[in-house]
């Protein structure tokens, strides 16, 4: 146990070193300040602007920014869906894979456009190298860049500045943040044995004399942006549990840090951009404490093991079901909480095999969406909770609510409410329909409490743009592909539109001078109140579902 806890502690310590450095760099990128990469990247960006016809880098309003996001994402989706549909006749298909069904192609396209990467297929048997490279790999960069661009536009609006230009923000997000880090990390993974080849699957002879086919492909570069962009969609069916995606402990450390580095650093970037690093560190500390607490209770459940198995063996063993021995229970726990907290969705073990405390913690992350949160958008959701907290505390003490020197009024609260309410709606409505008709809408492999968790997790993962799953669910059917596609769209674009309109509303407000009566948001007390609001509004909404799922399952096992 001690060794496992030391591994977790080392990872978190490295993360704390990364946060201020990467956060500062990203602030310079979006504030258009000079960076060390300017001599290389400025010519590249100018070339991209020239090719794309982006001659005027004019500032956009909130609605213009939202339209640009949606229009560009639609075009990307049409392009990728076309590649899937004609996969059988396109190059880079050494295994001659046919095109997937139309509903699987539609679901996969929407899933990757929305930065969710929810997979109802196994990559090595469904999509060709060309589809993985030019369709899925392309969307991994653009969807992550879209999230970062929206977050930066939102922060600019909060402090009264123009929201910026979406196409410029998207380009800079990819060229200055995603590409450099993905390139370096891809080379590191390559050095650890992750393959990068266009050769067809290899046939080998096993020690027993049988012939086995080993799937491979251009994995290393795919894996790096998969983790860095919080995409999470694996090249292989079992994702980062596969030894060709994640061979050893060092690669596991690199991939864990990759999925954590940008969302954690964005909070520091926010502090730099508003000129208040103290508030950024307070917010970071609040999220970090919740994050560590979730790791602790999940680790407790996994270390104690399954009481049914332990009673049968008359000994106490950790729960190793669904885990890779090369990682063990500790690294699987850290990964599970990190991947559901950051909305990455990649897995190095099976979440369906987690003990009830682990299932509770992962669902808790998906419900809140701010324990680091999705690429860019998770940070924006955190600020929405700050606005709600300012409004509520202002009502309680009889002060006019203000945030960053601007009044919070009815219009802002309406937008904030839409952002917070669309998430439970997108999860609970289709989840209830599925549970009412389990025989017709087949796919649930576990009866009882765990079956409830499977269904809710699938829709929560889609609504939160996470993509992981309790993979005991048989989800490659017409119902699951279409219903989760609708949830994916609702969970991605309704909040983005509301966020940008909220930012535009804040931008248009006249700044209010700070007085002795102004509620300060950079204090420990306000941060504690914010944590309470997050738990009340975010967690209690889903308490009945948690009670019917992992909590009931835990009591059944003898908590």
Curated annotation (Swiss-Prot):
It is a multi-pass membrane protein. InterPro entries: KdpA. Keywords: Cell inner membrane, Cell membrane, Ion transport, Membrane, Potassium, Potassium transport, Transmembrane, Transmembrane helix, Transport. Part of the high-affinity ATP-driven potassium transport (or Kdp) system, which catalyzes the hydrolysis of ATP coupled with the electrogenic transport of potassium into the cytoplasm. This subunit binds the periplasmic potassium ions and delivers the ions to the membrane domain of KdpB through an intramembrane tunnel. This is Potassium-transporting ATPase potassium-binding subunit. The system is composed of three essential subunits: KdpA, KdpB and KdpC. GO terms for cellular component: plasma membrane. The chain crosses the membrane at residues 2-22, 69-89, 135-155, 177-197, 254-274, 280-300, 327-347, 354-374, 378-398, 413-433, 482-502, 531-551. Belongs to the KdpA family. It comes from the Bacteria. It is found in: Cell inner membrane. It holds the Pfam family KdpA. One of its GO terms (molecular function) is potassium ion binding. Its main location: membrane.
């Amino acid at each position: 146990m001690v060794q496992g806890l030391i591994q977790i502690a080392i990872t978190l310590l490295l993360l704390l070193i990364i946060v201020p450095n990467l956060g500062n760099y990203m602030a310079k990128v979006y504030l258009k300040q000079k960076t060390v990469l300017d001599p290389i990247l400025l010519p590249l960006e100018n070339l991209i602007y020239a090719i794309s016809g982006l001659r005027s880098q004019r500032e956009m309003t909130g609605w213009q920014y939202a339209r640009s996001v949606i229009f560009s994402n639609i075009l990307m989706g049409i392009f990728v869906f076309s590649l899937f549909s004609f996969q059988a006749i396109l190059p880079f298909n050494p295994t001659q894979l046919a095109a997937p069904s139309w509903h699987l192609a539609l679901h996969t396209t929407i899933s990757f456009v929305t930065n969710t990467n929810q997979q109802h297929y196994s990559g090595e048997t469904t999509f060709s190298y060309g589809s993985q490279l030019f369709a899925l790999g392309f969307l991994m960069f653009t969807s992550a860049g879209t999230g970062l661009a929206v977050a930066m536009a939102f922060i600019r609006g909060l402090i009264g500045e123009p929201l910026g230009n979406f196409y410029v923000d998207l380009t800079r997000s990819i060229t200055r943040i995603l590409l450099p880090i993905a390139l370096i990390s891809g080379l590191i993974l390559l050095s650890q044995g992750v393959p990068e080849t266009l050769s067809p699957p290899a046939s080998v002879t096993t020690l027993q004399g049988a012939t086995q086919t080993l799937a491979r492909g251009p994995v290393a570069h795919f894996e790096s942006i998969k983790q860095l962009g919080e995409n999470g969609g694996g090249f292989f069916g079992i994702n980062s549990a596969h030894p060709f995606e994640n061979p050893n402990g060092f690669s596991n450390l690199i991939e864990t840090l990759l999925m954590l580095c940008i969302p954690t650093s964005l909070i520091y970037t926010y502090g730099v951009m508003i000129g208040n690093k103290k508030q950024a560190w307070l917010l970071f500390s609040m999220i970090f404490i919740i994050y560590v607490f979730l790791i602790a209770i999940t680790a407790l459940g996994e270390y104690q093991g399954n009481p049914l198995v332990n009673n049968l063996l008359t000994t106490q063993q950790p729960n190793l079901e669904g885990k890779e021995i090369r990682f063990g229970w500790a690294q699987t726990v850290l990964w599970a909480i990190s991947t559901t907290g950051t909305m990455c969705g990649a897995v190095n073990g099976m979440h369906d095999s987690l003990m009830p405390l682990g299932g509770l913690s992962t669902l808790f992350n998906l419900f809140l969406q701010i324990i680091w949160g999705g690429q860019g958008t998770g940070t924006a959701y955190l600020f929405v909770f700050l606005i709600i907290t300012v409004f509520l505390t202002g009502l309680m003490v009889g002060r006019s609510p203000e945030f960053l020197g601007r009044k919070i009024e009815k219009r802002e609260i309406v937008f904030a409410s839409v952002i917070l309410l669309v998430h439970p709606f997108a999860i609970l409505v289709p989840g209830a329909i599925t549970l009412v008709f389990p025989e017709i809408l087949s796919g649930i492999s576990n009866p009882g409490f765990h079956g409830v968790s499977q269904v809710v997790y699938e829709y929560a993962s889609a609504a939160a743009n996470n993509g992981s799953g309790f993979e005991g669910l048989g989800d490659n059917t017409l119902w699951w592909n279409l219903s989760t596609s609708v949830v994916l769209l609702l969970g991605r674009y309704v909040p983005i539109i509301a966020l940008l309109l909220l930012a535009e509303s804040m931008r248009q407000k006249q700044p209010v001078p700070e007085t002795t009566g102004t509620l300060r948001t950079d204090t420990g007390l306000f941060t504690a109140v914010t944590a309470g609001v997050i738990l009340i509004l975010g967690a209690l909404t889903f308490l009945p579902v948690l009670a019917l799922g992992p909590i009931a399952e835990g009591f059944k096992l003898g908590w």
